[in-house]
Amino acid sequence: MLFKLLQRQTYTCLSHRYGLYVCFLGVVVTIVSAFQFGEVVLEWSRDQYHVLFDSYRDNIAGKSFQNRLCLPMPIDVVYTWVNGTDLELLKELQQVREQMEEEQKAMREILGKNTTEPTKKSEKQLECLLTHCIKVPMLVLDPALPANITLKDLPSLYPSFHSASDIFNVAKPKNPSTNVSVVVFDSTKDVEDAHSGLLKGNSRQTVWRGYLTTDKEVPGLVLMQDLAFLSGFPPTFKETNQLKTKLPENLSSKVKLLQLYSEASVALLKLNNPKDFQELNKQTKKNMTIDGKELTISPAYLLWDLSAISQSKQDEDISASRFEDNEELRYSLRSIERHAPWVRNIFIVTNGQIPSWLNLDNPRVTIVTHQDVFRNLSHLPTFSSPAIESHIHRIEGLSQKFIYLNDDVMFGKDVWPDDFYSHSKGQKVYLTWPVPNCAEGCPGSWIKDGYCDKACNNSACDWDGGDCSGNSGGSRYIAGGGGTGSIGVGQPWQFGGGINSVSYCNQGCANSWLADKFCDQACNVLSCGFDAGDCGQDHFHELYKVILLPNQTHYIIPKGECLPYFSFAEVAKRGVEGAYSDNPIIRHASIANKWKTIHLIMHSGMNATTIHFNLTFQNTNDEEFKMQITVEVDTREGPKLNSTAQKGYENLVSPITLLPEAEILFEDIPKEKRFPKFKRHDVNSTRRAQEEVKIPLVNISLLPKDAQLSLNTLDLQLEHGDITLKGYNLSKSALLRSFLMNSQHAKIKNQAIITDETNDSLVAPQEKQVHKSILPNSLGVSERLQRLTFPAVSVKVNGHDQGQNPPLDLETTARFRVETHTQKTIGGNVTKEKPPSLIVPLESQMTKEKKITGKEKENSRMEENAENHIGVTEVLLGRKLQHYTDSYLGFLPWEKKKYFQDLLDEEESLKTQLAYFTDSKNTGRQLKDTFADSLRYVNKILNSKFGFTSRKVPAHMPHMIDRIVMQELQDMFPEEFDKTSFHKVRHSEDMQFAFSYFYYLMSAVQPLNISQVFDEVDTDQSGVLSDREIRTLATRIHELPLSLQDLTGLEHMLINCSKMLPADITQLNNIPPTQESYYDPNLPPVTKSLVTNCKPVTDKIHKAYKDKNKYRFEIMGEEEIAFKMIRTNVSHVVGQLDDIRKNPRKFVCLNDNIDHNHKDAQTVKAVLRDFYESMFPIPSQFELPREYRNRFLHMHELQEWRAYRDKLKFWTHCVLATLIMFTIFSFFAEQLIALKRKIFPRRRIHKEASPNRIRV
């Protein structure tokens, strides 16, 4: 009834005149109302609205960070994780190890006829974790030597013990009835040589290294009566002599010997009498101090068997506790949710394992297995972290830019995308320590520097980068000195100069490393301005300080000063930017806002010039202001002689000044720490002995023209490298002697010639006198000698250069103490600094020949230049080798424990024997570091592709990776990455993920595109260059100021090309003739096709434009990185974690290197867990509640269960649908039939009536 009423009213409305319009309006109002209602509903649920439609809220927090992000680009996080306690994983590890052993067994069978014994497994390296535990130069022999063996008899029994200084017996702590022998040595090198010599022999005795400790609670210790530990002194003491001079009188009188161990902050004392310990212990209680610090004396205990108390770095047993997971991933995810909530999704790459606490129902987290990302599934299973990392960019659905983390890496402070990448400066690259040297004694800066270095002349260093190929390379060690080069203040055994010498202010310190925001040890020297402030301001007093004043713009640097720095503390709060005039005297200039200083490092020996600076500062009100200053500099410095002696001789035409001895300062560096290593030869051996060459001393100006011309020719041949120095001396001596024999001018002969024999007799009264002088560092050897008043001629006798007048009578084996003062003149004021007295060997005194360059034998140059230093006026700091400590070995636990390292070392040795088919006794074997070897391997590949340069290793921290860049890298080196993917365990020929990625990003070059240059110049985008645009192009390819010839020359090139090139290339016919008009009517329309195909113009453009980096990047320091290697020393771990608490960093890595079998392992893990809970106590959305855990811990189990669940769900739905349909048909059969008849009515068929039939 109601339906009929509604139907009648509808028809009435539609039949009305305006009914149709009213209905249309009603429909529109209804639709608008519906949209408005929907909008209100969405506003009520604003957070869900933004999650669905706002890209700024597409992150794990579901909040908008629009005011903090530079762009709404989605950024995902990728983790690599493994559960080391999984039994299935441990079984697979054991299988891989057995497979490697079988392969090596087969290799030994091949070598059976040439191998006397299999290669020994690497010895376990034990680490002492006791308090103040130090390794001392002692060897412990078990069982003890016979009681009648004395120190003199010891070398006859063990020849390697010839350097032993003492021997005594002690009783075993656990078995006092038996003794062990303790052999004492003077140095670490002696004890290591003796230890290795004893291991090579067939001794039946077990040999141990000796340790001393103050921890008396550990069993197996022996108290040393005459030894004691001194602690509590300030940590600033780094040298033994420094501490010895500060000891109180009552303490030093009872000490026979003292040895400082600065790394452990203790000193070992050898007492005169064992009873002195009690007296000293009482005296320390009376507040005996050094610099306000109270001293503590502790007894010293000897131990040698570390197996019960130490951490094994190379344990061979597999156990679940060894690779135990400390749930670092849980806390790393908490750090992301707290400090980086802008992350979109999180992907966890595993070998199929699932964390028991992970909430798999969270849509923001996804487990990715190796099968999902590896292209070649035959490479699986893999246990190599580089192999896994090389495939993570192939994760499906991953953002273009993603952040890669290991589970032991977390965020300590708020982190934003611009900490990794910014549009203005590009990728931010965090670098740490340098790449290990390619060979022993060959720093990276030596490769391809124009000199052939013996240490680098091997395949590992690519034959010195080509310097040793042919005769193009010169010698780094030139006996006669560098005629054209200058001696910098680098290492005293290396002459400066060479092709790229200006790129390095010190050996191993490139100019690009200065002011790079982290302290480089090689740059922390005076010649580099102490790394331009990166290493702190402790040494700023050694630099020349200039204070910038608000009303002063002109400053004058004293002559000879090349390392000034400017303090702007009185002018501004911080520096914003700065620019300086292009001047060849400048090596480096930078602003250090931390110290409010401007550092200027200049090349020495340069003429006077003026440098202009344009600086932008910020005052205390954060207002920017500009400041222009001019600085007058002159880095030349004249010689400063301590004493000279001049004596005129009758026979000389010109006076001769005695060559002063240069003031030489040495640092007392132990011989075993000196670098590089070189082999010494006996100077009296027949191989090194050379025939004495006597060159007459002549006044060149008195010689005939033909003789002078011949000498000049010899000088040119030597300078060009056509002859060696030895050949030069022989030729010059023969030429002068032949002239003397044939000369009829006796007067000239008597006046101009003094032979070496007469020279010796003349200086006999002054043989014992030593003359000292300070020559400027910045001058070359030849330049320094030019300032003296005599012609210098150098001769070589028995491999040593001898000065001709007068030879200093110093024995080559003498050792003496040099007490010197360093004088530094600044603006007329002389300041003196007295360094500690040093014991140095002086084996020969040599003088350099003026303007002599050449190449000499490798053995001679290595020894002479390593031992003979002249003109070095600064005390060079002890060179610390570029090394890496606590390096990152991989995210997999078996890589941290070096589980496969022994097998890899043995495989390397066997492969070497197979390659050369030699006897294993003659095959030297050296344990290798796989991680360091792989860095060298990648560095060698990068050198071959992008050129030789010094590189550093990226920090172990989160890295932002671009999928496109990573794919380009792998497309460039497909074989290398495929080999990396093939390796089952970490290998020395792996492509290191971060190292290869970032150096490809920093080295990739974008080839110059002429079309882009044309588009830049074509400012009106007309496709044809106008006169004004042609002038712009001319300024880009010519030096300023632009001359008329430059402009007309460019136009003539274009005119000639338009006449020579075909019309279909220049496309001049397609250009309207009135589009551009030129001053020169002969100039055709300058189109893009004309410019790009005109070779003279393109050559000019290529010459003016340099290839640009394909990707922008910025080198960052280590200020925001905290890398801690967690070991089993509880007190050390607590100190490390407290340092992070006090100084939070953005990027924190706690690398687990805990020995889980150690007695203190559970304590360390508890301390670590407490630290995690204190930093991140709030559970993240990715965790299950504490009372729940995942049912499945492997993806294959989960996938099987999901497949079974889906199948069961499908059949359940089918059955349910069948039941519903059956129920409907059973109860509503009549209604369904009626509905069917109503929807599909049956049509009735009416038959026609028969025509013959008559209706009645």
From Swiss-Prot:
Pfam families tied to this protein: DMAP_binding, GlcNAc-1_reg, Notch, Stealth_CR1, Stealth_CR2, Stealth_CR3, Stealth_CR4
Q: Which residues form the DMAP1-binding domain?
A: 699-798
Give TM segment ranges. 22-42, 1215-1235
Q: Which cysteines are joined by disulfide bonds?
A: C438-C461, C452-C468, C505-C528, C519-C535
Q: Which residues bind Ca(2+)?
A: D449, D464, D467, D516, D531, D534, D1018, D1020, S1022, E1029
- Glycosylated residue positions: N83, N114, N148, N179, N250, N614, N699, N729, N829, N1009, N1129
Write down the SMART domains for this protein, in alphabetical order.
Answer: DMAP_binding (SM01137), NL (SM00004)
Note the effect listed for S385L.
Answer: In MLII; no loss of Golgi localization; no defects in protein cleavage into alpha and beta subunits; loss of UDP-N-acetylglucosamine-lysosomal-enzyme N-acetylglucosaminephosphotransferase activity
Instruction: State the top-level EC class.
Output: transferase
Q: What's the name of the protein?
A: N-acetylglucosamine-1-phosphotransferase subunits alpha/beta
